Amino acid sequence: PTIKELGCTTMLPDWQVRVVDGNHLASTEKRLGALRQERGAARPGFSVVVYDPDLDQVIDLQACEDAYASERVCVLPLLANAEPGQVWLADRLYCTLPVMEACEQVQTSFVIRQQAKHPRLIQEGEWQESVPVETGSVREQIIQVRGGYQCRRVELTLHSPTDSGDSSLMFWSNLPESVSAQQIAELYRRRWSIEGMFQRLEAILESEIETLGSPKAALLGFTTAVLAYNVLAVLKRSVEQAHRETQPDGWEASIYHLAVQVRSGYEGMQIALPSEYLPAIPVEKLAQRLLELARNIQPKQVAKSPRGPKVPKPKTWVQGKA
């Protein structure tokens, strides 16, 4: 509720966007007793994370200690908590009939990229006329799978292939006709926002601690970093909202610089300010209080400094003798 009061933009009007993806913790050389005779490094586990890109918040996650379990199975308990009015974005790994049936049971919508071994099609409708978009052209058709279940299949033909060499992408969706095929294709492009969130978790908050070999400890470290990220995202939004009128368009606060500011001053505040000087603030007044405090921050100290594009340097030959 607090971050919504601080203002936010929406990717798809009148819809709550949820991006779901798995985050596998890297293998670690920290050996548990049962693995000390094994050569390979152990994988502590993984988490399936539900991310709200509009609010920049992790909404839910399912932690799994078995690093080799299926993400498709672990996502089902998360889908049980989905609600009508939400649209879930997922990669092709989740293009399975149980995942789509779980969405139908809770009356939530989805946009899932098609994989090679997708559920067998019972019937395919005619393709509609292609419509040009920024990155290529889009067309759609109605498909039917086992059990009489129907959904829309959208094909995006790209002007230039992706890094993996794909020249066309297909998405399955049960969004209503009020959401066009162009909007579905554009919406899926924003699925990569969760990858940026994972990168910030690891680089800024050290969510993947290499010395933790125990699955419980490693997953506790990851979930603690997720909780800290949500708090920093609220602080980031409050700083941006407080200085929006005085800063140029596109100005953003940096979660990294905010984390540095919190880390550098926290111990001193614990010593200088006893607990009675830090009273509890009601939830309904928290957003206003955060804005009051954010106005005291110098924007330059927490401004985001995006790196410009790399300019390729010409390679020249050096004349030499053996």
Where are these regions (language model features)?
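Functionally engaged cysteine thiol sites
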Residues: 33
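Electropositive nucleic-acid engagement tracts
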Residues: 1-16, 21
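Extracellular beta-strand-rich solenoid/capping regions of secreted or surface-exposed proteins
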Residues: 36-38
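Single, function-defining residue in the core of a domain
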Residues: 12-16, 23, 27-30, 41-322
